[in-house]
Amino acid sequence: MRHRKIGRRFNKSATHVKAMLKNMVCSLFRYEMIKTTVSKAKELRRVAEPLITCAKIDSVANRRLVFSRIRDNKIVFKLFRDLGPHFLGQFGGYTRILRCGFRSGDQAPMAYIQLINRVKNKKELVYKK
């Protein structure tokens, strides 16, 4: 019985699920929008939102805590420099899940998970006419 068990397993081992979610959260923070299955997007939201909340207060302890979860210096830097201050006035609800149809191979329901009010890249702002 799975009583009081939190999280989805996706028919994978616990270490595989942990590594998969770590890679997906890095991709989400890097590109600010990724396409995945609906169930993976829902599980990813449980991992990503506490990291953004932690990044709103820039301290050494918070940086070390976030780095222990995602292990990528560039992403930690972007999280504390861009995303944390961007969501400073917002209390939760930093991500949005948009369903986008079904995968052609196995008809799995697909979705985009994106950050709310995405931070525009400087390249987009310069070349937009």
From Swiss-Prot:
Gene3D superfamilies: Ribosomal protein L17
GO-annotated biological processes: translation
Molecular functions per Gene Ontology: structural constituent of ribosome
Highest taxon, organism lineage: Bacteria
Keywords: Ribonucleoprotein, Ribosomal protein
Oligomeric form and interacting partners: Part of the 50S ribosomal subunit. Contacts protein L32.
NCBIfam families: L17
Family label: Belongs to the bacterial ribosomal protein bL17 family.
Entry protein name: Large ribosomal subunit protein bL17
Gene designation: rplQ
